[in-house]
């Protein structure tokens, strides 16, 4: 991927984020974050108290109250800045996509063929169902499906990948995206969306959407933070009469400072930024998530359904051998296999044609001159072939051909059954060829398991994630490849219905399921899965059914998607732990300072040896504001992620962020107190 990655603190983004942070000071914007709204209210109150003291309306230290008020405003501004910076990074990514949209003219065809008469119309006038012709050098004017032709397409504006890709009719690579450029040849495209509904439009709207919906975990955490805020608010409110009864009432300024330092402002100020940054990191991996809910669900996934081809294996299955049935000549089998594959544009189909040509000099026949009827492969029939003259030739999976033979009154030979088993045991895929009700033999298709994939599955297993391989191969082939790849389970001879049933079965057990897909037949399963990553090269139906789209069309990306989701959840949990642990140190700083005059015995709690009550309170407030700024890089980049079990991750994070949350404030508050004393501000 060659798309330029944004630096964490781009100067342009910083300036815009500072501006947006000030704009977010309005009460309407603050009300969306209850914790920070309390800080905002405290800032307003202390500002009013400062003005009242300056004008002599009430007594008190205007300087001390003013400085407290200033740092409370900084606390709100820093939280706003964190959110604005995260949003700014997403909007910058959206702006780079806007540059792809160009006003152009399109050749709208009057009939669905490349030599039909064409009208030049503005691309904005194209509607769903319109047929357009694009040639080398043209920008594709709409999202659609290729219905004729084949061409090299530059998709770098969308995917960031500089290498061109092939888009052609009749396969899994028929989907094209508006805004990409044709480099060679021509395509006839059927537009699949109306203006404003293109994939590019949806990408832009998603990443720059102003009203980001909170995810379930965010809502649950927000409720916890509100509950803690209410508890501390009530506790702080009782301290004034308590201290007044002791003969020396604590000032409102000190009580506000105490409240702000005790409530979980750190995570409260960074919560939105973490969510926005999670979606931004997903986009950085070239994956478009339709919502933060999808990213969060990726972090909770515990079952991965992985297509064998392209994910676990290299995906370039090639015909390697013809194994004829008893009494059948190998050349006869090769000839029938080649005829059945003439209209098969898949890599496997082309390899069968080539192998027959190489082995027996069987030249590829002209499809048009045969006057034959081609039978395409479907997920239901699981076979394809040709009807020519009085011959009915089919090739397909073992079970599909067996049903076909038996339905035509034939018998499936035992020797072919044995050949199928032998091929499958070697990890190859057997395809059976039949003419009428007579089985001619087996074609062996070989694929290679990706290097390092077994180790990745072992890491996922450590994390408690179950891996399930999905394949159309028979059970023996599937078992051999599953054992070699190291997956936990497999689904052989998979149909769309079987995939859907498997997902529902796992969900009924309370598990969250993730899968990838690219075809229209994957759409029901994608719609059912909790995390559904559709390939950008896939069909429009698949992209609409999924809740994420992988711009690189790399099925292995599903593992990275889960990692990003888990990193976002870990970041949120780690900073929550750090924020709550912070309160302990601030308690030791402010409580003795606030009540030292009323209850001198509380000086025993001044374990940090802070210079004076005022410096202690001011140091805690300053630290409370600055820690948000220091944690912004962590919130945006995410905590360090390692593939560990849930219990191991919990122990690790408690040590780092729990203990760190206790120790860092003691050090930070003491350092600030020393600096204030040296500067004569204590």
Swiss-Prot record:
Chief localization: membrane
Molecular function in Gene Ontology: ATP binding; ATP hydrolysis activity; magnesium ion binding; P-type potassium transmembrane transporter activity
GO cellular component: plasma membrane
Superkingdom field: Bacteria
Subcellular location, record wording: Cell inner membrane
Stretches that traverse the bilayer: 34-54, 62-82, 219-239, 254-274, 588-608, 616-636, 662-682
CDD domains linked: P-type_ATPase_K (cd02078)
Catalytic residues in the record: 307
Record flagged with keyword Nuclease: no
EC assignment: 7.2.2.6
Membrane topology summary: Multi-pass membrane protein
Protein name: Potassium-transporting ATPase ATP-binding subunit
Organism (species): Salmonella schwarzengrund (strain CVM19633)
Gene symbol of the encoding locus: kdpB
């Amino acid at each position: 991927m060659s798309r330029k990655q944004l630096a964490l603190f781009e100067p342009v983004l910083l300036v815009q984020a500072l501006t947006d942070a000030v704009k977010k000071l309005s009460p309407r914007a603050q009300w969306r974050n209850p914790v920070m709204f309390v800080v905002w209210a405290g800032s307003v109150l202390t500002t009013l108290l400062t003005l009242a003291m300056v004008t002599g309306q009430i007594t008190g230290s205007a300087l001390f109250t003013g400085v407290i008020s200033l740092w409370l405003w900084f606390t709100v501004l820093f939280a706003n800045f964190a959110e604005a910076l995260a949003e700014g990074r997403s909007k910058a990514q959206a702006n780079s996509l806007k540059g792809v949209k160009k006003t152009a003219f399109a050749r709208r065809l009057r009939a669905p063929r490349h030599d039909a008469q064409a009208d030049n119309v503005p691309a904005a006038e194209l509607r769903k169902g319109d047929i357009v012709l694009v040639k080398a050098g043209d920008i594709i004017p709409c999202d659609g499906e290729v219905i004729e032709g084949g061409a090299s397409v530059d998709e770098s504006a969308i995917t960031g990948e500089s290498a061109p890709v092939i888009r052609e009719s009749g396969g899994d690579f028929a989907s094209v995206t508006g805004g990409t450029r044709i480099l060679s040849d021509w395509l006839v495209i059927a537009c699949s969306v109306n203006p404003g509904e293109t994939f590019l439009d949806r990408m832009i709207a998603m990443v720059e959407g102003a009203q980001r919906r909170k995810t379930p975990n965010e809502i649950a955490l927000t409720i916890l933070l509100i509950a803690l805020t209410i508890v501390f608010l009530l506790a702080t409110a009782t301290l004034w009469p308590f201290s007044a009864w002791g003969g020396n009432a604590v000032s409102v300024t000190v009580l506000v400072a105490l409240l702000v330092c005790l409530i979980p402002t750190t995570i409260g100020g960074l919560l939105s930024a973490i969510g926005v940054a999670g979606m931004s990191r997903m986009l950085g991996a070239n994956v478009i998530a339709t919502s933060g809910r999808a990213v969060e669900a990726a972090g909770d996934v515990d079952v991965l359904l992985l297509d064998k081809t392209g994910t676990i294996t290299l995906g370039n299955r090639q015909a390697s051998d013809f194994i004829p049935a008893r009494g059948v000549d190998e050349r006869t089998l090769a000839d029938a296999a080649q005829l059945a594959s003439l209209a098969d544009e898949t890599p496997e189909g082309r390899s069968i044609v080539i192998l027959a040509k190489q082995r027996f000099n069987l030249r590829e026949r002209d499809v048009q001159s045969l006057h034959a009827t081609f039978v395409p492969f479907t997920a239901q029939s699981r076979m394809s072939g040709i009807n020519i003259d009085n011959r009915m030739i089919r090739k397909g999976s073992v079970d599909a051909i067996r049903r076909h033979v038996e339905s035509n009154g034939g018998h499936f030979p035992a020797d072919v059954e044995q050949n199928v088993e032998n091929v499958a045991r070697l990890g190859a895929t057997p395809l059976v060829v039949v003419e009428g009700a007579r089985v001619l033999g087996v074609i062996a298709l070989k694929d290679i398991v990706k290097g390092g994939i077994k180790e990745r599955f072992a890491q996922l297993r450590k994390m408690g994630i179950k891996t399930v391989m999905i394949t159309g191969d028979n059970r023996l082939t599937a078992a051999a490849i599953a054992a070699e790849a190291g997956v936990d389970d497999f689904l052989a001879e998979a149909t769309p219905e079987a995939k859907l049933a498997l997902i529902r079965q796992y969900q009924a057990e309370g598990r969250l399921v993730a899968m990838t897909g690219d075809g229209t037949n994957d759409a029901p399963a994608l719609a059912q899965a909790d995390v559904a990553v559709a390939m950008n090269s896939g069909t429009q139906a698949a992209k609409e059914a999924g809740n994420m789209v992988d711009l690189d069309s790399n099925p292995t990306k599903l593992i990275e998607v889960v990692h990003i989701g888990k990193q976002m959840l870990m970041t949120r949990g780690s900073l929550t732990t750090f924020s709550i642990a912070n309160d302990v140190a601030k308690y030791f700083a402010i409580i003795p300072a606030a009540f030292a005059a009323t209850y001198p015995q509380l000086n025993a709690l001044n374990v940090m040896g802070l210079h004076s009550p005022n410096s202690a309170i001011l140091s805690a407030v300053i630290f409370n504001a600055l820690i948000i700024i220091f944690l912004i890089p962590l919130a945006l980049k995410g905590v360090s992620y390692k593939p560990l079990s849930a219990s191991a991750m919990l122990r690790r994070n408690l040590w780092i962020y729990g203990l760190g949350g206790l120790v860092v404030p003691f050090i930070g508050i003491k350092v600030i107190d020393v600096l204030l004393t040296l500067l004569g501000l204590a």
